[in-house]
Regions:
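Structural signature of eukaryotic scaffold interfaces centered on beta-propeller domains
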Residues: 2-21, 68-91, 133-144, 191-197, ...
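Beta-propeller domains
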Residues: 2-5, 17-90, 96-124, 158, 180-356, ...
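Short, conserved, GDST-rich strand-edge loop motifs in beta-rich repeat architectures
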Residues: 14, 19-20, 27-36, 82-93, ...
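Short loop/turn segments immediately following beta-strands, especially the blade-tip
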Residues: 43-52, 107-118, 168-171, 230-236, ...
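Surface-exposed loop and turn segments in beta-propeller and other repeat-based domains
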Residues: 55-76, 120-133, 176-185, 238-249, ...
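Asp-box/WD-like beta-propeller blade repeats and closely related beta-sheet repeat scaffolds
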Residues: 110-194
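Blade-level signature of beta-propeller repeat domains, shared across WD40, Kelch, NHL, RCC1
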Residues: 394-470
């Protein structure tokens, strides 16, 4: 019998764009407060021909509700086809779900019944801290030689945060990834350029800096993250620190070009101390992407919006404005469209980044927002809070999904009336522009929706070792 790779693995991003449409979404659902409810993984029907389209069709409750589930990922993906570390026998089966609140990691098996995953392993915080030296695991990515994860801090809740490794078969923790971290202390997201043996990491804050909400004193002092770091992926050594400037606070989501030949990507900055704007920066390698130093340039700036102080939460009243608060970005597999979530204003923006140094705004929609409270077209009289936050793109780039909860302690500061959670879908137009799907509006009773993953893979789940460019 022939052994064939998992059919959801693709050598190149262009081939992945030809994949069948997704039918299910996995959504991290957070319990907030002492209401007796537990955290959960929800399963949403994405098949437009289904009678249950846009509904929660499955759910697995976690043993406890204090995890603050965050950016989960698959045990294996298209990176398993990379020739330097081939693992084509692997299958995309397990979801690795980190909790930054509890330092637990839950492993879910989706194979037997994709609509009803089963928890097959729980890594407790004591084991995680003992084996990695870190706490608050944040983001999971499947790599060519195992599962990689980021963590916000050390065992005492301060720095440094960093990267840890996990065996993709047994889910045993291997330990810290870094051999030489150089000056790096703060951590958040990470991604890589597999064709160039380069990893990029970003910065938010340590657990002690974020767990009780945004600390205005630390923010105004420029103490949150404002750098990206470049690493030798193979040797696990720090190579270069790139500082965006201390006024650029919270350098979060990283989205590299999907083409492994390229050496550029985009990173979002939550807020500028100068004017409350948010921004998107492009990182790139000088000397035509060969052996030069890495650099950054600001390519998008989104201004704050003036607002009536009476409509603002206490944290913002003195500023008389709503900052955009860019909290997530995502890049389509063809590297053409960048999507940006503005969690403050409620705007969700599409940019054409075919020329990555010169993005062009091609569309936007509004849902929620601190002041705007924009309704969904399915319920035009229902004001919504929260705003576009975690965003995921289908492999063909035609469908975009987003949820509205950021992080519980920060939800309470910016939306003190309590985030009522929802998930929406946007249809992208081939030449640019987008429209909210009026038939897709999912509400989550008593739980808050965060990260979304699409069955079979999506635009931020996989990385590729083969280019579509000849």
């Amino acid at each position: 019998m022939a052994l064939l790779p998992d059919p959801t693995f693709y050598p190149s991003p262009g081939m992945a764009m030809q994949a069948p449409p997704e039918r299910l979404a996995y959504v991290a659902l957070l319990n907030v407060g002492n209401n007796g409810k537990r955290d959960a993984m929800g399963v949403v029907d994405l098949d437009p021909s289904s009678a249950e389209y846009g509904r929660l069709v499955g759910r697995v409750d976690f043993p406890r509700g204090d995890n603050e589930l965050h950016h989960f990922g698959w045990n294996a993906c298209s990176a398993c086809l990379c020739p330097q570390t081939p693992h084509a026998h692997m299958e995309r089966r397990y979801l690795i779900v980190p909790g930054i609140g509890s330092s637990r990691i839950h492993i879910l098996d989706t194979k037997a019944n994709p609509k009803q995953p089963k928890i097959v392993k729980v890594i407790e915080p004591e084991e995680f801290i003992k084996k990695t030296g870190y706490t608050s695991p944040h983001t999971i990515h499947c790599g060519p030689d195992g599962v990689y994860g980021s963590a916000l801090g050390a065992a005492n809740g301060d720095g440094p945060g960093g990267i840890f490794l996990m065996d993709a078969n047994t889910f045993e923790l291997k330990g810290q990834w870094e051999q030489d971290r150089g000056p790096q202390q703060l951590a958040y997201d990470f991604w890589w350029h597999l064709g160039h043996d380069a990893m990029v990491t970003s910065e938010w804050g340590t657990p002690n800096m974020v767990k009780d909400g945004l600390n205005a004193e630390l923010l105004l002092a420029g103490k949150y993250g404002h750098k990206i770091h470049i690493w030798d992926l193979d040797k696990r050594h720090h190579l270069q620190e790139v500082d965006l400037g201390a006024e650029q606070q919270m350098v979060l989501e990283l989205r590299p070009s999907h083409d492994p030949k390229k050496t550029y990507g985009f990173v979002g900055v939550v807020i500028s101390l100068k004017d409350l704007s948010s921004s998107i920066w492009m990182w790139y390698r000088e000397d035509d992407g060969k052996k030069g130093k890495w650099a950054v340039r600001k390519v998008i700036e989104i201004p704050a919006e003036p607002a009536d102080p009476d409509k603002l939460p206490p944290l913002l009243k003195g500023f008389k404005a709503v900052p955009p608060l860019v909290s997530d970005i995502n890049l389509s597999l063809d590297d053409r469209f960048l999507y940006v979530s503005c969690w403050g204003t409620g705007e969700f923006i599409q940019y054409d980044v075919s020329d990555p140094a010169n993005p062009k705004k091609t569309g936007s929609v509004y849902v929620g927002g601190i002041v705007r409270r924009a309704a969904h077209p399915s319920k035009p009289k229902q004001e919504l809070n929260g705003a576009p936050q975690m965003v995921e793109i289908s492999r063909d780039g035609k469908r975009i999904y987003f949820t509205n909860s950021l992080y519980s302690p920060w939800d309470e500061q910016f939306y003190p009336d309590g985030v009522k959670s929802w998930m929406v879908k946007v249809d992208a137009h081939p030449k640019g522009g987008m429209t909210l799907d009026e038939k897709f509006f999912v509400e989550f009773d008593g739980l808050r929706a965060h990260q979304v993953r699409l069955e079979g893979g999506d635009a931020s789940s996989d990385s590729y070792c083969f280019s579509d460019k000849k």
